């Protein structure tokens, strides 16, 4: 007898059910898998909603979260720069001492990736030079 994994049907209403507070009773064994499927559905929904994620590109969950954070912060900056809210925002910043300029996480990760690649290239150059020094 072969082992098989259950086929899960794609449900578009999973988020709607959660927002309405509708709960189904599940056996304790099914709950971890159900939770995993719900989390994957949530990541898929986030990927659809954030405009900076290319729709046909495969991205990790970490990248999705980074894009979501960037998107939320960009929306906050846009909202904060709205003319009617600027005075309220400045009043709030003077109380908490905040700063509105920021570097997106995706840009920081790109910079780190570039530095990592440069370090690998540099170490390979040193290795090549050390080989030529040894007879």
UniProtKB/Swiss-Prot annotation:
Gene3D superfamilies: Helix-loop-helix DNA-binding domain. GO terms for biological process: cellular senescence; circadian regulation of gene expression; embryonic digestive tract morphogenesis; endodermal digestive tract morphogenesis; negative regulation of gene expression; negative regulation of transcription by RNA polymerase II; neuron differentiation; neuron fate commitment. The gene is id2-b. Its main location: cytoplasm. One of its GO terms (cellular component) is cytoplasm. This is DNA-binding protein inhibitor ID-2-B. Transmembrane segments: none annotated. Keywords: Biological rhythms, Cytoplasm, Developmental protein, Nucleus, Repressor, Transcription, Transcription regulation. A motif (Nuclear export signal) lies at residues 108-117. Residues 23-75 form the bHLH domain. Pfam families: HLH (PF00010). It is found in: Cytoplasm; Nucleus. Heterodimer with other HLH proteins. Transcriptional regulator (lacking a basic DNA binding domain) which negatively regulates the basic helix-loop-helix (bHLH) transcription factors by forming heterodimers and inhibiting their DNA binding and transcriptional activity. Inhibits the activity of both neurogenic (neurod1/neuroD) and myogenic (myod1/myoD) bHLH factors. May play a role in the regulation of the circadian clock. One of its GO terms (molecular function) is bHLH transcription factor binding.
């Amino acid at each position: 007898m072969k082992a098989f994994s259950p086929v899960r049907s794609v449900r578009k209403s999973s988020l709607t059910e959660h927002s309405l507070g509708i709960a189904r009773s599940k056996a304790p064994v099914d709950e971890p898998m159900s939770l995993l499927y719900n989390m994957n559905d949530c990541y898929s929904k986030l990927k659809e909603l954030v405009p900076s994620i290319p729709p046909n590109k495969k991205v990790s969950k970490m990248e999705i979260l980074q894009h979501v954070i960037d998107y939320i912060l960009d929306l906050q900056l846009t909202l904060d720069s709205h003319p009617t809210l600027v005075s309220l925002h400045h009043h709030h910043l003077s109380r908490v001492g905040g700063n509105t300029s920021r570097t997106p996480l995706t840009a920081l990760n790109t910079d780190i990736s570039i530095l990592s690649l440069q370090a690998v290239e540099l170490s390979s150059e040193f290795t090549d030079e050390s080989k030529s020094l040894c007879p």
